[in-house]
Amino acid sequence: MSMFKEFRDFAMRGNVVDLAVGVIIGAAFGKIVSSLVANIIMPPLGLLIGGVDFKQFSWILKPADGAAPAVVMEYGVFLQTVFDFVIVAFAIFMAIKLMNRLYTKKEVEKPVAKPSAEETLLSEIRDLLKEQNGKAQ
């Protein structure tokens, strides 16, 4: 089997294609959440705290020295990233919870199958044999 054919077979399996679609949608969803946090959630939150822009929160570890730039720890950007993570994690949690609920409903709604004619006959034979063995003793 040629390497190209093996790769094609691998890439066209359902799981790989589904995974690729999931990664692409996840990346797009991540951008939406980042925009939501940076442009919608953080500005009003900063306003409530007193007109604070979280992106400006930083510690200067070493000031700029001539041509060397300052060494800065930008914890405000980190806080925004934490908000991004919490929102994405909550959205994934809700999606999984919904999927689990739908899955359990399908299991509950599954009707109990009636025994086949063969199973019914075998059950009757078993019961008769038990009855005969009980009388013999």
Curated annotation (Swiss-Prot):
Its main location: membrane. One of its GO terms (cellular component) is plasma membrane. InterPro entries: Mechanosensitive_channel_CS, MS_channel, MSC/AndL, MscL_channel. Gene3D superfamilies: Large-conductance mechanosensitive channel, MscL, domain 1 (1.10.1200.120). The keyword Membrane applies. It is found in: Cell inner membrane. It is a multi-pass membrane protein. Keywords: Cell inner membrane, Cell membrane, Ion channel, Ion transport, Membrane, Transmembrane, Transmembrane helix, Transport. The chain crosses the membrane at residues 10-30, 76-96. One of its GO terms (molecular function) is mechanosensitive monoatomic ion channel activity. Channel that opens in response to stretch forces in the membrane lipid bilayer. May participate in the regulation of osmotic pressure changes within the cell. Belongs to the MscL family. PANTHER family: LARGE-CONDUCTANCE MECHANOSENSITIVE CHANNEL (PTHR30266:SF2), MECHANOSENSITIVE CHANNEL MSCL (PTHR30266). Homopentamer. HAMAP family: MscL (MF_00115). This is Large-conductance mechanosensitive channel. The gene is mscL.
